[in-house]
Amino acid sequence: MVMKPYVIIFSTVSIDGRLATKTGYSELSCPYDKQRQHEIRSEVDAVMVGANTVRVDNPSLTVKYGKNRRNPIRVVVTRSFNLDPSYKIFTTPPSTVIYTSNYESEKVEEFIRKGVIVRKFLHLDDLLEDLYDNFNVRRLMVEGGGHLIWWFIKDNLYDEIRITISPRIFGNGVSFTQGEGFIGEDSPRLELIDAKICECGNEVHLTYKKYMT
């Protein structure tokens, strides 16, 4: 039996479902939402983002708030390998793993010399199996961006979605899922597990799981 991690998709979006404006502005989270994000990070074994999130936000993906400051493994998924080794995620602890379908890139050896683990992948399900078998990842948090979230949802490789609705309207920009979309009845159904008004009083945090018939 193929074993894979339990996958939690976490995101904060505007009322109209955007992760960022068309210019890349993405400051949506209140301090309480940021703390919630870091607490979830501390409870998982790995946190994953796409390459564009690394290029635009330059995140460290470490745990800064909460009682448990244990940092998860950081995972970056890229097809092009258009990444700079000076980004925070590659120059600070803990370990970072890059999964790429462009393993022949001349940059691979440069990243390996800096201590970054680089793995070749063609399909997300193979990537998840590798994380489970070789990195002991049992719980994985996927933080974006929109293309990566779409791949997970399209391939039905998620277990839970935790989403915070921020009181902003962007009108255009990066959607929660950036992909070709579903057609009618093939779109997945979700079951609402929990709904909370944020401590700030102006945001709502929702937890969904896949609807089980």
Swiss-Prot record:
It comes from the Archaea. Gene3D superfamilies: Dihydrofolate Reductase, subunit A. The keyword NADP applies. InterPro entries: DHFR-like_dom_sf, Rib_reduct_arc, RibD_C, RibDG_C, Riboflavin_Biosynth_HTPR. Its EC number is 1.1.1.302. It holds the Pfam family RibD_C. SUPFAM superfamilies: Dihydrofolate reductase-like. Keywords: NADP, Oxidoreductase, Riboflavin biosynthesis. GO terms for molecular function: 5-amino-6-(5-phosphoribosylamino)uracil reductase activity; NADP binding. It catalyses: 2,5-diamino-6-(1-D-ribitylamino)pyrimidin-4(3H)-one 5'-phosphate + NADP(+) = 2,5-diamino-6-(1-D-ribosylamino)pyrimidin-4(3H)-one 5'-phosphate + NADPH + H(+); 2,5-diamino-6-(1-D-ribitylamino)pyrimidin-4(3H)-one 5'-phosphate + NAD(+) = 2,5-diamino-6-(1-D-ribosylamino)pyrimidin-4(3H)-one 5'-phosphate + NADH + H(+). NADP(+) binds at residues 53, 57, 79-82, 122, 145-148. One of its GO terms (biological process) is riboflavin biosynthetic process. Pathway: Cofactor biosynthesis; riboflavin biosynthesis. Transmembrane segments: none annotated. It is an enzyme of class 1 (oxidoreductase). Belongs to the HTP reductase family. Catalyzes an early step in riboflavin biosynthesis, the NADPH-dependent reduction of the ribose side chain of 2,5-diamino-6-ribosylamino-4(3H)-pyrimidinone 5'-phosphate, yielding 2,5-diamino-6-ribitylamino-4(3H)-pyrimidinone 5'-phosphate. Homodimer. This is 2,5-diamino-6-ribosylamino-4(3H)-pyrimidinone 5'-phosphate reductase. It comes from Saccharolobus solfataricus (strain ATCC 35092 / DSM 1617 / JCM 11322 / P2).
